[in-house]
Design a protein with these regions (language model features):
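OB-fold nucleic-acid-binding modules
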Residues: 1-53, 57-83, 87-241
C-alpha cells in the first residue's frame, strides 16, 4: 500500500505548511502545491467509528492537518498510530470553514482526492504504534477556548470535569430524526459554564448511545467551523465518567 518511491524526510512542518497557505485557507480558497513539499507525521484521527468520514488527521510535533480522501474504511491501511510521509506536490490545499485541508478540487473548492491519488502520494513508515508523542492530547480548559488560535485547529485535546448539557438519561449523541441533517450538535459544559459544541455524525457507531450524565473526562479533536470551535469525538470510548 502506498508509494515507496517517495523520498525520505519532510521538507516542511505541518504548522509551517498551514502558515504558508494561511491566506488561502482562511479565505476558504484553493491552491495547488506545485513545488517539492513533503510532510511527515502520525495519524491521530481515522474513520473507524464513522464519526470522521472520508478523512484522516495527521500530526507532527507542530500541528495537525486534515486530509480528504474519497474512500471509506481508510483505517484498514491508515489507522491511528500509523506514521507516514505525504508527498504534497500536485495535491491541493484549501480551507473548509477556514480549516486547512489537503485534497483535490471539488466544485472549485478543496475536496476529497480519489483513493488511487492518495496511494500515489503516501508512503507508510513502519507498523502502527500508539506510543508516538503526537498521540498525547493537550489539556483543554475553558480559558483556552478564548486564548488559543483557531488557525492551529485541529488540536488533539483532553478535558476534565465537563458535562453534556442535554444529558438526561434519554438524549442520544446524534439521533437520526430523518431529514437532511447528517450531524447533530450537543454542548459540553465546563465547570464555569463555558460551552463547547460537540458535533457527531448520525452515522457514527456511537450515534445512538445515550449521552452520559455527570462529570466526564473527554478526549477528542478540537476543530473549527469558521469562528466557532467544535469537538469531534474519535470514538464513544473517549468519553469517560
Amino acid at each position: 500500500y502506498g508509494n515507496n518511491n517517495i523520498k525520505d524526510g519532510r521538507t516542511i512542518s505541518i504548522a509551517n505548511l498551514k502558515k504558508k497557505y494561511a491566506s488561502v485557507i482562511s479565505a476558504n480558497g484553493l491552491q495547488q502545491i506545485t513545488e517539492e513539499t513533503r510532510i511527515e507525521g502520525v495519524i491521530v484521527g481515522d474513520d473507524e467509528s464513522g464519526n470522521i468520514y472520508k478523512q484522516l488527521m495527521i500530526a507532527d510535533e507542530s500541528g495537525i492537518i486534515v486530509i480528504g480522501i474519497n474512500n471509506t474504511g481508510l483505517y484498514a491501511t491508515c489507522p491511528v498510530g500509523q506514521k507516514m510521509i505525504i508527498d504534497c506536490e500536485g495535491l491541493y490545499i484549501g480551507g473548509y470553514g477556514e480549516l486547512g485541508q489537503l485534497g483535490s478540487v471539488y466544485n472549485g473548492k478543496v475536496g476529497r482526492m480519489p483513493g488511487y491519488m492518495w496511494e500515489e502520494h503516501v508512503r507508510l513508515l513502519g507498523e502502527p504504534n500508539l506510543f508516538y508523542p503526537e498521540l498525547a492530547p493537550k489539556t483543554l480548559t475553558a480559558a483556552d477556548l478564548s486564548s488559543w488560535d483557531k488557525a492551529e485547529a485541529p488540536i488533539l485535546v483532553n478535558m476534565n470535569d465537563v458535562s453534556f448539557e442535554n444529558a438526561d438519561g434519554e438524549e442520544l449523541y446524534a439521533e437520526d430524526k430523518g431529514g437532511s441533517q447528517s450531524a447533530i450538535e450537543q454542548n459540553l459544559v465546563f465547570e464555569d459554564g463555558t460551552k463547547l459544541v460537540v458535533r457527531t455524525s448520525t452515522y457514527a457507531n456511537f450515534a445512538n448511545d445515550v449521552l452520559p450524565q455527570g462529570k466526564l473526562n473527554v478526549t477528542g479533536l478540537l476543530s473549527r467551523y469558521g469562528n466557532t470551535w467544535q469537538l469531534t469525538l474519535r470514538s464513544g470510548e473517549e468519553v469517560k465518567r
